[in-house]
Amino acid sequence: MEKLFKEVKLEELENQKGSGLGKAQCAALWLQCASGGTIGCGGGAVACQNYRQFCR
């Protein structure tokens, strides 16, 4: 079981883009923004705002 877990160093976390959001989360926000809210849950405008705030 220990082999399944990877030790994450603080430097790795600091180098991640997105203020704590991962690439997959930012990609989901971008997709919601680009689709005008027709894909995924939530409105397009809120997704765009969150993407600009947390993923740029």
Swiss-Prot record:
<comment type="function">
    <text>Bacteriocin active against Gram-positive bacteria. Inhibits B.cereus spore outgrowth, after the germination stage, approximately 1000-fold better than it inhibits exponential growth of the same cells. Inhibits B.subtilis strain ATCC 6633.</text>
</comment>
<dbReference type="GO" id="GO:0031640">
    <property type="term" value="P:killing of cells of another organism"/>
</dbReference>
<keyword id="KW-0325">Glycoprotein</keyword>
<comment type="subunit">
    <text>Monomer.</text>
</comment>
<feature type="glycosylation site" description="S-linked (Glc) cysteine">
    <location>
        <position position="41"/>
    </location>
</feature>
<feature type="disulfide bond">
    <location>
        <begin position="33"/>
        <end position="48"/>
    </location>
</feature>
<dbReference type="InterPro" id="IPR026479">
    <property type="entry name" value="Glycopep_SunS"/>
</dbReference>
<dbReference type="GO" id="GO:0005576">
    <property type="term" value="C:extracellular region"/>
</dbReference>
<feature type="disulfide bond">
    <location>
        <begin position="26"/>
        <end position="55"/>
    </location>
</feature>
<feature type="propeptide">
    <location>
        <begin position="1"/>
        <end position="19"/>
    </location>
</feature>
<keyword id="KW-0929">Antimicrobial</keyword>
<dbReference type="Pfam" id="PF19151">
    <property type="entry name" value="Sublancin"/>
</dbReference>
<keyword id="KW-0964">Secreted</keyword>
<keyword id="KW-0044">Antibiotic</keyword>
<keyword id="KW-1015">Disulfide bond</keyword>
<keyword id="KW-0078">Bacteriocin</keyword>
<dbReference type="GO" id="GO:0050830">
    <property type="term" value="P:defense response to Gram-positive bacterium"/>
</dbReference>
<protein>
    <recommendedName>
        <fullName>SPbeta prophage-derived bacteriocin sublancin-168</fullName>
    </recommendedName>
</protein>
